[in-house]
Amino acid sequence: MHAWPASEVPVLPGKGRDLRIHDTATDGLITLDPGPVARIYVCGITPYDATHMGHAATYNAFDLVQRVWLDTKRQVHYVQNVTDVDDPLLERAARDDIDWVALAEKETALFREDMTALRMLPPRHYIGAVEAIPGIVPLVERLLASGAAYELEGDVYFSVEADPDFGKVSRLDAATMRLLSAERGGDPDRAGKKNPLDPMLWMAAREGEPSWDGGSLGRGRPGWHIECVAIALDHLGMGFDVQGGGSDLAFPHHEMGASHAQALTGEFPMAKAYVHAGMVALHGEKMSKSKGNLVFVSALRRDGVDPAAIRLALLAHHYRADWEWTDQVLQDAVDRLGRWRAAVSRPDGPPAEALVEEIREALAHDLDAPAALAAVDRWAALQEERGGTDEGAPGVVSRAVDALLGVAL
């Protein structure tokens, strides 16, 4: 599976700061020092509907992570998956009387278009769950052989009790885990499981649903969590720098993934930092495909909204914050974009070197994009009020905003 084209990232003079970022597992800021190649895995979409603002906010957060690392002159090895076979996808395809493969391909193509328009840097490896199945099957077989997994009526489940570190990623109590498991794709009430929280590793073939050869497992398809583990271990190995996604992935997805990896390798954690973006709401409720309360990136683009304004609307909120999408949020972003473009369109302006350092410092401190935007606002206001004589300043600002914030002026 291919990703989307990359936009060129300007190289800024000097060197950026090392990233200090909030780690869910420790509930605190940690400083990441990846070495010459930073490794990041971000959980991708289930392609049964278009990219909404909640998706965009999540991928914007981890695009900033990449940009901070690139500014420190590191290479970035970024991997993202696509859950291109899953119950919601199959259910939507059946509802709309469309082939599930065609639906997945259509929505994945639209996602690529949205990411390109928003100038999100693409992953080096963009891997679908289906294409990863040949690598998933041996992992499930290993877990069975080690006793970390068991069979139940043809299905294979992971035993959370096989992981002595289970629970350390999300830091939730058992009752909350059980509640969230039921809400987020688990089956805690299924009879015969050793522990209600045990997640499925391999689903035996169901009539009328797609299935693949699972070797000794029989025909079926993989569970959600083992898909990401297989892809991450194959392309990044253990101990990569960041595993990212929305805050609703901390449990069960990232918790279970860490447990699978621990049982397979004997190492913990799978990622040095578990980083989670906040939720975006509309009319008081979290944007959700199941609820249908969505604002789509593609719809805004069709309505003529500049993608740079959409990106600024996302950047106006700290990545970990929960916030609400409103018409005013978008209008504020449109107005800000206009002010910034007017400011950099002049032939000269106030000195900008200090501004570049302010943006760098803001982003290095847990991706504080609102602080970075405020710094650019101050420079733009100064430009409007009294201008300046530095002939290179507007270009410096334009390149810094492009390189660090992903906004083309």
Curated annotation (Swiss-Prot):
Family recorded in the similarity comment: Belongs to the class-I aminoacyl-tRNA synthetase family. MshC subfamily.
Record: residues binding L-cysteinyl-5'-AMP: C43, G44, I45, T46, T58, N81, V82, T83, W224, G246, S247, D248, V280
Gene field: mshC
Pfam families, sorted: tRNA-synt_1e
InterPro entries, alphabetized: Cys-tRNA/MSH_ligase, Mycothiol_ligase_MshC, Rossmann-like_a/b/a_fold, tRNA-synt_1_cat_dom
Cofactor comment text: Binds 1 zinc ion per subunit.
NCBIfam families to which the protein is assigned, alphabetical: mycothiol_MshC
Keyword line: ATP-binding, Ligase, Metal-binding, Nucleotide-binding, Zinc
Stated role: Catalyzes the ATP-dependent condensation of GlcN-Ins and L-cysteine to form L-Cys-GlcN-Ins.
Gene3D superfamilies: Anticodon-binding domain of a subclass of class I aminoacyl-tRNA synthetases, HUPs
Subunit and partners: Monomer.
Name by which UniProt lists this protein: L-cysteine:1D-myo-inositol 2-amino-2-deoxy-alpha-D-glucopyranoside ligase
Motif annotated as 'ERGGDP' region, chain positions: 183-188
Alphabetical GO biological process terms: cysteinyl-tRNA aminoacylation; mycothiol biosynthetic process
Organism: Streptomyces scabiei (strain 87.22)
Molecular function (Gene Ontology), one example: cysteine-glucosaminylinositol ligase activity
